[in-house]
Amino acid sequence: SAPYYDDAATKEYNRLNDTNDSVFVMRYFAETANTGNYGNSVAGNLNMDPSGQTVDAQLFFDPGWNQYMYSNTSGRDLHYDAGAMLVPSNAALDYWWNHDGKVLQNMYGSWDNVPIKVLVKMMNINMINTFSETVPSKFNNIVDNTTKVPLGVTTSDVDSCFMGCNGVIYLTNKVFTPADYSSVSFPALVNQNTMSVIYWAIENLNFEPYLNSMDSYYSFITPTNNAMLSYVDPCSYAASKTVLYTFFYDDKAKTVKAHRYYYDLDSGSIDTSTSLSDATGDQVKDRLEDLLNGLIIVGNVEDGHSYYKSKGGSPIHVTNAGVVGSMTVAGGLQLERSKHVIINKIYDQSENGNGKAYVVDDNIPLTSKRSTYNILQKDERYSEFFKLLDGSRGSLISQKLSGTYSCVDYNISLFDAYNYTVYVPTNESIMKLITDGYLPTWDDYEKLTVDDFGGDRKAYNNGRNTLADIITNFLRYHIQDNSVFIGGNIMNNVKFETSKINPLNKRFFSLTVNADDNSLSVEDQLGNMRNVTKQSGLYNNIGREYWFQVSGSGTSAVDQIYNASDVVVNQIDGPLFYEQNQLRPWRAVIGLSTNGAKLSKAGRK
């Protein structure tokens, strides 16, 4: 709280008392407070002190103001309701401080040393903005203000009740604490000196309710402020020079900002000779939101596997799980460069909370810079599948989304801000399909002429369209929703949808996947069982496809991540089929002679 000068009150006081003095009003920093003057109350957000500096923390509402109720409801005022507060007795607070609150006592020593940013979490959970809905018979309506889960208040928890002019005080014999104190985000909250950047993102980008949920178990990779100096901007992947963001917390403005520099990924050197503008506020939020989605893993990374999917769908590779100093994590970017990030400390919040926080100090696990197109193009062992995909520009792959958003090279247009698996049959198996006359190539498509159809242009156009459909449908059936890995979650006959729609029921054809720590197999609609080729560079190839929104140009260009899709590419030992009709010669399908085409039982090899 702080005293604020009130000009209207000063004038009225001096008029009534024929004097020349100044009147100040004590106000609490609060999300709902009086930001007006004497005689003209205005409900607003009071987040600045009298000198204009942004404050560290705010109460839920101003308990010293009589009109905080119904500030936005026409025709209602404080006479219709009041607020309430759960206030623990001194004895209850002392007991909590020496038992469940011991972690704060050990960290800060005394109540006076606990930062207001930490204390306000407890204060706000005990501030209730409606008394009428939380009378003793309705105590189950009192919930955590972030998770909306009931606090479990009972009448036996209340020793006394005191009525004030603007609300009610329930004196309690126990302390009700927020989910923040049990959450995997708690280490970031209480270590503001070293983790203020990531906690600002948690608090301001709406991750607090998610991480406070006690219904899930989280493994939260928590970067220190030092680690946040090494964020490689994915929006620069399409540019000639990579850009590095160095995030920092501006204590005066109480917000996170970022300097930007050109950066050499290979050498790790920062180019300070070229002046780049600092990131805008929107860019900071955009990058931090994407980063946080990649740092939160729903589940226990110490359960014995190697690959885990983050909240956003990006994979994280884990080694030596649970061992501080030797445990490592790696995102797609690290895996592409054969690097990893060491876990420096582990905070265990699992006993009374919702998981563990894994602290990284030297770097951050970052997402891949490779698209599916890039992964396939760079490895000759994927060449036949790549030729088919490359020929489908404009239908399955694109450089533009909605004519507005750009990408690194080519993105698969079927992807939609989710995670996927692309199964790539071996070159030999695809070539056999082509040689046997079952699968056309784009060369076959281009070589079709009207004369092949006796001059019938309609038949010619239909033939070309059918040929394109045969190729693209073959590709579509090899693209599956959900990324699956060797070394990821164990799967037993789990069905996943592909990108190929069954025209009969308008549902997507499925694949059946079996996977463990050593192998992965996939079964198609015809019962063919294909195995992932477990050779270096042919499985668990991680990629990410971004759509960027760019305005401006040069060093002052403002770019945003519009959306991103994660992908893993796995080679399989044979093609996948969704229907028997795919094993008809394509020339016969479009009404041409099959003379010269070698035909065989390709589907059962």
PLM segments and residue spans:
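Mature, structured domains of secreted/extracytosolic soluble proteins
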Residues: 1-605
